């Protein structure tokens, strides 16, 4: 998956390289998150439910934040660039996670995998939008950088944990969880559109 993207990055020119850089960063932190999740699950002797609802949201959201913090500290980007970088990182994280899930579990239940992919992708994009949009605001105010970043990370972790909790619970809650991020994204898009007009 990475080699075609690398070739595309070389062919697209300098303006598009940031996109590919954050795409690779998202995939890389997804891979590292899997190892770190496994380590903490073994360290705390967590069962699948605890690992999914307590460990994974914290590890994954912190890992998605690290490339953004590096970008903010080294390059001091504009607000719109911060938002784009956060969403691209989250989107590539979700894409790689869904590919790993598909490889691990097979395509026997295509409809389940399809809805899981959409729900998980939307959830990661919402978490990325929370962090990216918030960082674009709080990093313009020196006094708010640390507390604001921690608060945004906490909000993203909470949303992610609620999503994972509903998924792990199963039954009707699982299907609500798959629909919830999609509905939130649609509502957010409508609100954003109406505020512009």
Task: Show which residues each predicted segment covers.
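Hydrophobic alpha-helical segments at protein termini of multi-pass membrane proteins
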Residues: 1-197
């Amino acid at each position: 998956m990475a080699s075609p993207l690398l070739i595309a990055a070389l062919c697209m020119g300098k303006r598009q390289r940031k996109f590919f850089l954050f795409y690779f960063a998202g995939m890389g932190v997804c891979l590292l998150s899997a190892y770190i999740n496994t380590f903490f699950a073994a360290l705390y002797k967590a069962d699948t439910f605890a690992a999914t609802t307590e460990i994974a949201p914290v590890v994954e959201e912190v890992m998605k934040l690290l490339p953004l913090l590096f970008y903010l500290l080294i390059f001091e980007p504009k607000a719109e660039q911060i938002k784009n970088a956060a969403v691209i990182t989250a989107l590539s994280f979700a894409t790689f996670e869904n590919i790993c899930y598909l490889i691990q579990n097979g395509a026997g239940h295509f409809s389940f995998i399809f809805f899981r992919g959409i729900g998980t992708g939307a959830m990661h994009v919402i978490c990325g939008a929370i962090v990216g949009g918030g960082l674009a605001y709080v990093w313009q105010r020196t006094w708010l950088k640390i507390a604001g970043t921690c608060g945004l990370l906490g909000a993203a972790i909470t949303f992610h944990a609620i999503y994972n909790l509903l998924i792990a619970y199963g039954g009707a809650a699982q299907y609500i969880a798959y629909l919830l991020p999609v509905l939130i994204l649609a509502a957010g898009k409508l609100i954003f559109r109406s505020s512009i007009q």
